[in-house]
Amino acid sequence: MHVQKKSMTKLDLAVLSSLSESYTLLPFMIFSSLLSGEPDTVNFFVPVLILYSIERACIIGIRGFGEINNPYRILKDGLFMALSGAILMILSYLYRPLLMVSALLVGVGLAPMRAMFIPLFSKMVEKDTSLKKGKTLGLIMYLLMMIFVMVLRNNRLPIIPIFFLLYIAYITFIVLRIDGDEIYENKKAFDSSKRNPVFFLFGVLALLSLLILRQYQMSGVSVLMWLTPLTIVIFFAVELYRRRKYKDYTFQTYWVGGIKCFIMLYSLVFHTSVGNTSMAMMVYLAIAISGIGSDIVRKIMSKKIKGPALSNLCIILSSLFVFLLTLPSKVLNIVGIILSSIFANIVVAEVNVNYMNDKRYVPEERALVKTRLQTAGSIMEQLVLFFTIYIVGEAGIHENLLEPYVAGTPNPEIALILRATGLICSFMLLIVAILIVCVAGKKRNK
């Protein structure tokens, strides 16, 4: 396929940026909206389960192929896979099992999107600094797309799948027009001489953990919970064996992955379980709004607070605002999601700066390292959240708290005990945040 090479415009960059921001949440929303009317619980959950789990596992495992030389090629190949998945999504209206294959292709294809976009974006901005403004426009596009999907989620016509196909097709066209191979001197995607199979192990552990955790979330079979600690033990054992030198922003990355996961997952489980089903899409929308809000708030705060002080303050503020998710008010819950996510996003932005200057990694790989650790943090938080739900449920009412969520039979009577679960997890996040600020901060520049 030959496409005439052209320089990137601000609009092109904005569209690319919108996908780098929404590569996880947007497909998740789309698959959920397509399956919201399915009577069979297994048919409803399996594609969403595959999408999320395989995407997270690929982010962790991709480094096993070798050191990254050419992010452009990885991004391009991933978009072709996602495009194939988008086509199968439409064909699934004719043959439903294709939706599972679609989820697999979209998950694998979009997994490296953000980690590969960041170094490519940096190269583009070096050539034309005016392109930097396209990133803000990308956040606005991201928000508009979320609203579009939310409004049309119950439409019987395949409007959303067609939109997703056109969206991915246009982004693929944009990427093909960029002479990315020239930017990276026609290098191969990976330096195979620097393969590291341990990342394949981490990827498999992540996949198993997520499949088990999400299957527990969606089936309520409590015995599944006891299968996950083994994977976490193996993860820590391998980390100790590798003797990595952790920086303070390494711990910040784990933490921010955890709190962002908690904000979305706890909110969805709580509101669905107690009957606030309309809040599910509002949660997604609030998270999208926080993306724009964090950009504005960071610019204001960075004028007065610099460096580590900014990320430390935002860690504490995000940890405090997350308590609003546990209060008996939908308005305060949404405010909590927005504010906590805003400050968590600022931490992510500050962490990005640190990783982009981290000489331990080649420039093309620094964003992937950050994304990989953030993913690991989200997996750990899911384990903590679901174990807490399981233990509190058994100790409090001697029942599985996820049963109303799984069965689709809301039970407002468990609202109090679910809030107690949220409080416990929020306190743990706050304690970890304080430890990072007070203890891990001493490791900076050591």
What are these regions (language model features)?
Residues I54-I60, T228-Y241, M282-K304:
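Transmembrane alpha-helices of Major Facilitator/SLC transporters
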